[in-house]
């Protein structure tokens, strides 16, 4: 990979709860006590309505992942929430969806010549990526400025995880869905201009301390 000897080792990738993290030749399902950022590839994230199953797993268990659409994931989540509220409904079972490789890409475009992609990261997170997978201070600035602008917005954001060239946005699924959030973030991204004129807080550290 770009950041290490193993193909799974990339520069940065934020982690959502329920994400499958490929750490070298080992796969790890990240729970709520797992890290929020690291340098390994995360190909899929469990639907929110299925997260309870993670707590039932034991070492050595075999897990089969089945692709679902956002709409199907919402049905599963709603059925689970109804059950929690003693409104028992049958949890829907779906045939595996035949999704294209681009299904998770909610939006893509350019900002002043720099390409960006907004990807699905489970149901309640989106991942905004700027430029190619490489160390680049200009791409870092894009992610930093976007995070600063989102912090000033009134969007229902729970938290954000910045990477080197990316930003994961965790939002309140009860107020906005992933496609709506992606559209809001894209609109703000399009207003990022004149990075050469942007100043960010910094400090000088002299070594040895």
Q: Could you say what each language-model-derived stretch is?
A:
Residues 1-209:
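Glycine-rich active-site loops that engage anionic ligands at enzyme catalytic sites
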């Amino acid at each position: 990979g770009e950041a290490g000897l193993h193909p799974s080792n990339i520069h940065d990738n934020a982690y959502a709860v329920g994400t499958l993290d490929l750490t070298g030749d080992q796969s790890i399902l990240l729970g709520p006590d797992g890290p929020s950022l690291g340098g390994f590839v995360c190909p899929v994230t469990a639907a929110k309505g299925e997260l309870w199953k993670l707590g039932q797993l034991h070492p050595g268990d075999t897990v089969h992942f089945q692709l679902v659409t956002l709409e199907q994931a919402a049905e599963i989540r709603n059925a689970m929430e109804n059950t929690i509220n003693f409104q028992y409904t049958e949890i829907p079972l779906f045939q595996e969806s035949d999704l294209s490789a681009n299904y998770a890409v909610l939006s893509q475009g350019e900002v002043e010549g720099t390409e960006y992609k907004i990807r699905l990261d489970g149901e309640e997170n989106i991942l905004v990526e700027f430029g190619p997978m490489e160390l680049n201070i200009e791409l870092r600035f894009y992610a930093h400025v976007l995070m600063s602008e989102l912090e000033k917005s009134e969007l229902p954001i729970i938290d954000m995880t910045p990477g080197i060239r990316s930003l994961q946005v965790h939002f309140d699924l009860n107020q906005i869905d992933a496609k709506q959030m992606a559209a809001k973030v894209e609109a703000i991204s399009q207003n990022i201009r004149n990075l050469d004129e942007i100043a960010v807080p910094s400090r000088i550290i002299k070594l040895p301390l």
